[in-house]
Amino acid sequence: MAASMCDVFSFCVGVADRARGSVEVRYVDSIKGKGLFATQLIRKGETIFIERPLVAAQFLWNALYQYRACDHCLRALEKAEENAQRLTGKPSQILPHPELCSVRKDLHQNCPHCQVMYCSAECRLAAAEQYHQILCPGPSHDPRHPLNKLQEAWRSVHYPPETASIMLMARMVATVKQAKDKDHWVRLFNHFCSRTANQEQAIVHKLLKGKFKDQLELLLGLFKEALYEEALSLWFTPEGFRSLFALVGTNGQGIGTSSLSQWVHACDALELTPQDREQLDTFIDQLYKDIEAATGEFLNCEGSGLFVLQSCCNHSCVPNAETSFPENNFVLHVTALEDIKPGEEICISYLDCCQRERSRHSRHKILRENYLFNCSCPKCLAEADDPNVTSEEEEEEDEEEGEPEDAELGDEMTDV
């Protein structure tokens, strides 16, 4: 059973009533599935809705490499200066205006049993109440613990740049296991789109690469050992486990947090003399050059989450709304990029800014590989007669990876 319309808004926060009054979820057609539509005029720059995820989890390699984040909400735990020191590889790196760092270490708390860290007592209690009682391994760091074996197996088959985590699936199961009203949570998770068997296989192949059938069988065995739940018995069959992978692979919204970026934004808001502004901007530019030289592109604490209302937003290469995480945790904001009229569909982009500037052929390649659909937004329709050309680098990637086999492609996005 799909989630009710009431359930769709149940994780909205802050302006939840505003969201109910300004948007609605409609069934579009058999290709697009659901979509989110404005019911009143939404002005450019307005926050359309703010939403918490059903579940979220930090990527496992990201956590292993000491990107320290709250185990529940993914808020960055390092002070901005500590963050800069680690990313530049310079223990003596000093930041000006340290008072602009928003990290409150005095509020941090850890689980008294397994010692995972939280940004606050509220997050520690929220995790314990929702899923952590099931997932807490206790004081033992025994690599033979079922959850430790599961995480190690995942890291061995899914390398950076990461796009999903087996622990997001684990938290889904643990949430249902701990819940008094199990049907409520199953209904919420069933809200996310379903795929055909061939589409699911293509998504699993994308996530696991290589001998994905053997890897999927290994992960399923460890998943059963660690988390089996009778109420979710279908998820523990080969077909159900593959469906769970496809759900997470196509519906997981990436989350990124950084105490350093928060500090930079605070610096941008300072009222300074032109000379001081130039000096500070030069310092920050050099800092990011040093970070790029030492660390490359991996700057943030990274993870993913499942958002019910946001998942109703379909894709467009010319979106009229965007997602962001301005609170430096897993709370998602959807903001209008232009005026949106009543009855108009609210679309976000699943591509980043650079990807959206690529050719139609390149955009479709990315969307097919990651979401199994061909876009028919106004930009793609306008470029339909353009030649199918792409860069030499992408052609080399095509030769190395190949296109997903047996994937059934939709003409448009389906509820991701």
Curated annotation (Swiss-Prot):
One annotated GO molecular function is: protein-lysine N-methyltransferase activity
Binding residue positions for S-adenosyl-L-methionine: Y350
* Residues annotated as domain SET: 21-351
* Alphabetical keyword list: Cytoplasm, Metal-binding, Methyltransferase, S-adenosyl-L-methionine, Transferase, Ubl conjugation, Zinc, Zinc-finger
The segment annotated Disordered runs over 383-416
User: Principal localization?
Assistant: cytoplasm
For this protein, the record's InterPro entries field holds:
SET_dom (IPR001214), SET_dom_sf (IPR046341), SMYD5_SET (IPR044422), TPR-like_helical_dom_sf (IPR011990)
Do you know what upregulates this one?
A: Up-regulated by retinoic acid treatment in embryonic carcinoma cells. Present at low levels in untreated cells.
**Pfam families linked:** SET
Catalytic reaction equation(s): L-lysyl-[protein] + 3 S-adenosyl-L-methionine = N(6),N(6),N(6)-trimethyl-L-lysyl-[protein] + 3 S-adenosyl-L-homocysteine + 3 H(+); L-lysyl(20)-[histone H4] + 3 S-adenosyl-L-methionine = N(6),N(6),N(6)-trimethyl-L-lysyl(20)-[histone H4] + 3 S-adenosyl-L-homocysteine + 3 H(+); L-lysyl(36)-[histone H3] + 3 S-adenosyl-L-methionine = N(6),N(6),N(6)-trimethyl-L-lysyl(36)-[histone H3] + 3 S-adenosyl-L-homocysteine + 3 H(+)
Query: PTMs?
Result: Ubiquitinated and degradaed by the proteasome in response to mild hypothermia (32 degrees Celsius), relieving repression of the SP1 gene.
- BP GO annotations: methylation; negative regulation of gene expression, epigenetic; positive regulation of cytoplasmic translational elongation; regulation of stem cell differentiation; regulation of stem cell division; transposable element silencing by heterochromatin formation
Query: Where in or outside the cell?
Result: Cytoplasm
How does inactivating the gene affect the organism? Mice develop normally and are fertile. Conditional deletion in the stomach inhibits malignant progression in a mouse model of gastric cancer.
What does the annotation say about its assembly with partners?
Answer: Interacts with the N-CoR complex. Interacts with EHMT2 and CBX5.
UniProt lists the family membership as follows: Belongs to the class V-like SAM-binding methyltransferase superfamily.
Q: What is this protein called?
A: Protein-lysine N-trimethyltransferase SMYD5
- Provide the species name: Mus musculus (Mouse)
Gene it is expressed from? Smyd5
